[in-house]
A protein has these predicted regions:
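Short, structured coil segments at secondary-structure junctions
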Residues: 49, 71-72, 150, 173
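Catalytic-site signature of metal-activated, phosphate-bearing donor transferases
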Residues: 10, 84, 88-91, 97-98, ...
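Short, well-formed alpha-helical segments that are part of the catalytic scaffolds
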Residues: 31-49
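Short acidic donor-binding/metal-coordinating loop in glycosyltransferase active sites
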Residues: 58, 78, 96, 103-106, ...
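Conserved donor nucleotide-binding strand/loop of the catalytic core
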Residues: 65-93
Length: 275
């Protein structure tokens, strides 16, 4: 299935407050989590307007499951299957067809909440993307790769599903994708060292996925991919306006491109040597 863009944009008038709630499609918020107790409370609070909250926990040892249950979420234990399959499991476990998929370190802003309620009162599409704002090195990014990081998170599961990708998963749909206003706030609160460790793991997983799919890399991709990425996000998308945090964020993304293809080339050489 392919994902197609649509120019439809919803921006509700926040100054107009109805005297009673509008009838709308019921929806579930689904969250995957593991050892996320320090972040999950804020996520659950921001999602409290949902008709149901489902938290799929993968063996937390820090009280994540207990915290979620204590705040009214339905908690399901499931061994880790990779990001895409874990999120799809959560979607299928929901009671309602309309779902909003969140990570434990994300929060729904008030403008986004208003947009979600508005579109669910009269859905004009089956899938909606929203701008995701990332906090990095203590700064909310406003340009470059960090914003607007359009993310398809609200959808009717009868028309869309998560991919099986173990990392950098995406929602697949054959329907047009509309956009709504209001930021999805992403604040991982992790250290830079922790962030870099995670990126190293992710690029290894990406390289493995590409190799198994029969993809191959050469010197051109190794050199051009990070260079073009830097030009795109630092200059064309004004990443330089985010100061040092913006530069570091984009530079890490460029390094990720280099490392991904370098690891893919290493897998290629290993395969040739073993023949």
């Amino acid at each position: 299935m392919s994902k197609r863009a649509r120019s439809l944009v919803y921006s509700p008038n926040m100054s107009q407050k109805p005297h009673c709630p509008l009838p709308r499609q019921p929806f579930s918020v689904v969250i995957i989590a593991r050892n996320a107790a320090t972040q999950l409370a804020a996520c659950l609070e921001s999602a409290s307007f949902a008709d149901e909250i489902v938290v799929v926990d993968s063996g937390s040892s820090d009280g994540t499951a207990e915290l979620a249950a204590g705040r009214g979420a339905r908690v399901i234990q499931k061994e880790w299957m990779g990001f895409g399959r874990q999120k799809q499991f959560a979607v299928e476990a929901a009671r309602h067809d309309w779902v909003l998929s969140l990570d434990a370190d994300e929060r729904v802003s008030e403008p986004l909440r208003a947009s979600i309620l508005a579109v669910l009162a009269a859905p004009a599409a089956q899938a909606y993307a929203m701008p995701r704002r990332n906090r990095f090195m203590g700064r909310w990014l406003s340009h470059g790769e960090g914003y607007p990081d359009w993310s398809l998170r609200l959808f009717d599961r009868r028309h869309a599903r998560w991919s099986d990708d173990p990392v950098h998963e995406k929602v697949l749909t054959g329907e047009p994708v509309a956009r709504i206003q209001g930021d999805l706030l992403h604040d991982s609160a992790e250290t830079l060292a922790g962030y870099l460790d995670k990126q190293n793991l992710y690029t290894s997983m990406q390289a493995e996925t590409l190799f198994k799919a029969g993809k191959r890399a050469g010197m051109a991709q190794l050199l051009l991919s990070p260079a073009l990425r830097f030009v795109k996000f630092y200059f064309l998308r004004l990443g330089f306006l985010d100061g040092a945090a913006g530069l570091v964020h984009i530079a890490i993304g460029c390094c990720n491109s280099f490392h991904k293809y370098a690891k893919l080339m290493a897998l290629q050489r290993k395969a040739v040597a073993s023949e």
